[in-house]
Amino acid sequence: MKTHNRRRTALRLAAAAFGLVLSMGAVAKDAQLLNVSYDPTRELYRDFNDAFARHWQATQGQKVAIETSHGGSGKQARAVIDGLEADVVTLALAYDIDSIAERARLFPANWQKRLPDNSAPYTSTIVFLVRKGNPKGIRDWPDLLKSGVSVITPNPKTSGGARWNYLAAWAYGLKIFRGDEAKTRNFVTALFRNVPVLDTGARGSTTTFVQRGIGDVLLAWENEAFLSIEELGPDKFDIVVPSLSILAEPPVALVDRNVDKHGTREVAQAYLQYLYSPEGQRIAARHYYRPRHPQHADPADIARFPQVELVTIEGVFGS
């Protein structure tokens, strides 16, 4: 009888130990996330991914491996629609994320209301990058239409940055032509006649201008302009801030159907929320994005951003 009891006790202990091992294994299992992002966020998310992974392991005891895919924002949106299983998307325009919601129904149409600031944790704008000394004397949008000026911008059909470029030029035209859309259209059309090549994404256009030496002026995300000077030196390029530009608000979203399929909802939600944290805001500013909460950033990083009149999509084009 005693032997039988001892055997039962041993079996219970073994079962408990086995259950503990399974439980520990479940806790220790690494999480994996795929962030499908737009073209010039490589450096930003390289640092942010490392910071979030450290934060998640310290607070949750779980390792997380984060892969990030980059490309023109419109092209990336189409990839997700066609089946690329992103856990989160961090794209250049709300329009691109709307298209995923509408065409693939991977998350609700009201996705933009689920995080603060219309789900845009940082902002940017459009500036001009010119060669050192500004040999073509480019100061504002009308200078881009001059004969002999070669303008580099990506393709608006595939690039979110290119669409911000287009909207900024259009907003300027509406201002100087007092709302006359026909004159504004002619203005923007003339600008694009000076574009010799249309790359698919913003980083490709930066490469065309910076490394291949094509063009007199690059219409650039502000962060791309700063990064070009950081990497190649202030003796190569100058930044020209136009009299008017646009408040670019690159949004982020959770891809509900995919995170539920992957079992990553909790970590993916935390990943996006961490963009709004003091650390996330510091990292954004460090990489030349304008943080929503500048009080969390290094004051030296904030001081780099020039003052510029910024219009919004809603203010110029309506909601």
What annotation goes with each model-predicted range?
Residues 36-38, 130-132, 150-177, 192-195, ...:
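Short beta-strand->loop
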Residues 120-125, 185-192, 199-200, 232-265, ...:
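Periplasmic-binding protein-like
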Residues 23-26:
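N-terminal signal peptide c-region/cleavage motif recognized by signal peptidases
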Residues 29-159, 299-302, 309, 314:
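N-terminal segment of the mature folded domain
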Residues 176-243:
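Ligand-binding pocket segment of bilobal, Venus flytrap-like solute-binding proteins
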Residues 2-13:
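Twin-arginine (Tat) signal peptide motif
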Residues 259-319:
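Extracellular/periplasmic juxtamembrane helices and adjacent flexible linkers that interface
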Residues 133-139, 158, 171-179, 258-266:
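Short helix-loop capping/hinge motifs at secondary-structure junctions, enriched
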